Amino acid sequence: MQNKDACKSLSSWVSLSISLLVLTVPLIWPYNSTAFPIYAQQNYESPREATGRIVCANCHLAKKAVDIEVPQAVLPDTVFEAVVKIPYDTQIKQVLSNGKKGGLNVGAVLILPEGFELAPSDRIPPELKEKISNIYFQPYSPEKKNILVVGPLPGNKYSELVFPILSPDPATNKKASFLKYPIYLGGNRGRGQVYPDGSKSNNNVFSASTAGTISQITRQKKGGYEVIIKTTDGREVTDIIPPGPELIVSEGESIKADQLLTNNPNVGGFGQADAEIVLQDPLRIQGLLVFFASVILAQIFLVLKKKQFEKVQLAEMNF
């Protein structure tokens, strides 16, 4: 009985510790509070919409290029690598959630064909493990092992990511077939401009909520600004600008509704790319090799037969 109580107490303590860790991590590293792809996992059953749009684009509004490299074809039950490239100028800095400047983080979601999944550690060759380094990949959900997510990671170290992938074997996986399959990639560098609830992050532009004249601008102690706009009917409307964006207006200036009050601090962006891969049937390859061998042998026999015929003709002419 005492052992059961002790186990319950230990379990409660572990749960409490994990909860506290989850709550305090964003406070210690505030720039991860808008990190991807955790928002997509929490809010969407699938990261790819019916239109082909990856949901990360809902929060990361700017477009930037990404690239993916995979083999043209793979054999069943084989480990191969998918190389994801998220290029950007590593010298640039982004606005963090506290308004300060810092390095960009990167992340990616890789949507594989059904049956393809993250390769088990004991199946990954040593040379591939070196390329992966200490990167932690995870499935999008327990039901969607073919969708892999990674990040956020320091962009200056991981602008190129290597995913270890295990191909399915149609002999044991009835859902897999020897076909050509599409692979979809979504990759991002930097923080998002919008939170999942639709509110703006401080990595966005801010505009005036009403038309009027800016009567007062007050810089806040923790950063950011309080902009008071006096309307034509004498009302005073206060717009709050969080730390990060810089004001591009001044006191006494007349402004219109929705006129920009700040610059655009965002230096990152999200991009999509796709590729194709063939799950190749080994018997098909063997059949192709046999066909090529038969063609080569037929050519050899044809040449030999021709030479033999020429020798016979030459002998008859000499006779």
From Swiss-Prot:
Its cofactor is heme. The gene is petA. HAMAP family: Cytb6_f_cytF. Heme binds at F36, C56, C59, H60. One of its GO terms (biological process) is photosynthesis. PROSITE patterns: CYTF. It comes from Staurastrum punctulatum. Binds 1 heme group covalently. Keywords: Chloroplast, Electron transport, Heme, Iron, Membrane, Metal-binding, Photosynthesis, Plastid, Signal, Thylakoid, Transmembrane, Transmembrane helix, Transport. This is Cytochrome f. Residues 1-35 form the signal peptide. It is a single-pass membrane protein. The 4 large subunits of the cytochrome b6-f complex are cytochrome b6, subunit IV (17 kDa polypeptide, petD), cytochrome f and the Rieske protein, while the 4 small subunits are PetG, PetL, PetM and PetN. The complex functions as a dimer. The chain crosses the membrane at residues 285-305. GO terms for molecular function: electron transfer activity; heme binding; iron ion binding. One of its GO terms (cellular component) is chloroplast thylakoid membrane. Component of the cytochrome b6-f complex, which mediates electron transfer between photosystem II (PSII) and photosystem I (PSI), cyclic electron flow around PSI, and state transitions. Belongs to the cytochrome f family. Its main location: plastid. It is found in: Plastid, Chloroplast thylakoid membrane.
